Amino acid sequence: MAKRVQVALTESIASLGKEGDLVDVAPGYARNFLLPYGKAMNVTPAVLKQIERKKEKEKIAAGKLKQEALDFQTALSTIGRFTIKKQVGEDGVLFGTVTNGDVAEAIEAATKKEIDRRNITVPDIHNLGAFTAKIKLHPEVNAEVNIEVTS
């Protein structure tokens, strides 16, 4: 039976785990690849303490990010409606569509807070009127904003 060696990963490796995980690997894999290339460290009590401290800091930082997202969600709901002006043809149809970038600009103008347009889901909007867009502020926090498209 082959002996296994326990190492702590210093970076994420798809076949083993993510940074900070303790994994059991073959001694040759650890000695010839993981340790020389700095992808893992031998497990010692000091390394275990370091990993634990790092995980605590990450947990606190994740809690702060979630709280910021919840606060921003509340701010978006208090504003109520965002207005986007677009050019309209004679038949009342927009020239082009309202994109997630347009919604991001409207939110940034109203809140002075930058938001990534890739986190905004906008329905196909080709007419004037009121619509709802969904925003992913955090993996656990989503918000819905009302959009009014005017000419």
From Swiss-Prot:
Family statement: Belongs to the bacterial ribosomal protein bL9 family.
Chain coiled-coil ranges: none
Organism whose genome encodes this protein: Prochlorococcus marinus (strain AS9601)
Database matches in NCBIfam families: L9 (TIGR00158)
Example GO biological process: translation
GO molecular function terms attached to this record: rRNA binding; structural constituent of ribosome
Domain of life: Bacteria
Keywords: Ribonucleoprotein, Ribosomal protein, RNA-binding, rRNA-binding
Transmembrane segment boundaries: none
A cellular component annotation (GO) from this entry: ribosome
Pfam families: Ribosomal_L9_C, Ribosomal_L9_N
Known role: Binds to the 23S rRNA.
InterPro entries according to UniProt: Ribosomal_bL9, Ribosomal_bL9/RNase_H1_N, Ribosomal_bL9_bac/chp, Ribosomal_bL9_C, Ribosomal_bL9_C_sf, Ribosomal_bL9_N, Ribosomal_bL9_N_sf
Name of the protein in its database record: Large ribosomal subunit protein bL9
PROSITE patterns (alphabetical): RIBOSOMAL_L9 (PS00651)
